[in-house]
A protein has these predicted regions:
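Gly/Trp-centered helix-boundary motif
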Residues: 1-96, 100-101, 107-111, 122, ...
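Conserved RecA-like P-loop NTPase ATPase core
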Residues: 8, 175, 194
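Low-polarity contexts
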Residues: 19-22, 175, 182
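Generic hydrophobic transmembrane alpha-helix motif, especially the helices
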Residues: 59, 63, 69, 90-94, ...
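Helix-loop-helix units of permease transmembrane domains in multi-pass membrane transporters
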Residues: 72, 171-178, 186
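Membrane-helix interface/capping residues of multi-pass secondary transporters
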Residues: 13, 107-108, 140, 180-182
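Transmembrane alpha-helices
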Residues: 78-94, 183-203
Length: 203
């Protein structure tokens, strides 16, 4: 923590980035308190105040139907952050598990899981997400699941490559000789070495 703060203190760009992230997260979390027109996040129509330029009442102006753009942006932050957090919370564990199993267990696990991953990777991500949404009801939850289907293969491929490179290392062989289970080797020995790459991919 101290090292991170020291880096931020000596690097203006890092500090600026951290402040921008803090502003976005703060705006999303406290949107109900900050937004001057919280009711404008929904299907509100106000043709008296449509297309207004920024002023003291409407900080960023209004849209075509009179809704305050600043309020809507704050609530959009909330939806975007929630989407990102939920998608990562589902996609990363799936992708990591698939990659570890295929890379470490090998044989038909490798062939079956990686061919499944290749099928998903062969489809353009946005096309895949839109195709899924075309088959189900267009809700936020279904949207999250569609994006999850788009993202997990990338983590699977990343962890698979790392696992293939690590499984013959001395520390892995030592754990196997000592009688460690496959799950222990995968999640306690190999996975920690993949965490930096996973975190980089997540951000």
């Amino acid at each position: 923590m101290k090292r991170t703060l020291a880096i931020l203190a000596t690097n203006p760009l890092s500090l600026l980035g951290a402040l921008l992230v803090a502003l976005v997260v703060g705006g999303a979390v406290f949107a109900d308190l900050i937004a001057p027109f919280p009711e404008h996040r929904g299907a509100v129509v106000d043709f008296v105040n449509f297309n207004k330029p920024p002023d003291g009442t409407y900080l960023m102006g209004t849209d075509l139907v009179g809704r305050d753009l600043f309020s809507r942006i704050l609530y959009a932050y909330r939806i975007s952050l929630m989407l990102g957090v939920v998608v990562l919370a589902i996609a990363v564990p799936i992708g990591v598990t698939v990659g570890l199993m295929a890379g470490y267990l090998g044989k038909w696990w490798d062939y079956g899981l990686m061919r499944l991953t290749d099928v998903f990777l062969s489809i353009p991500p946005l096309v895949l997400a839109m195709s899924i949404m075309g088959l189900v009801e267009p809700t936020l939850v279904n949207g999250m699941l569609a994006v999850t289907a788009m993202w997990w293969p990338w983590y699977a491929r990343l962890v698979y490559a790392i696992t293939r490179g690590e499984r013959e290392e001395g520390y892995v062989l030592a754990a196997e000789v000592l009688g460690a289970s496959r799950a222990h080797v995968m999640f306690r020995e190999i996975l920690p070495n993949a965490v930096p790459a996973i975190l980089t991919k997540m951000t």
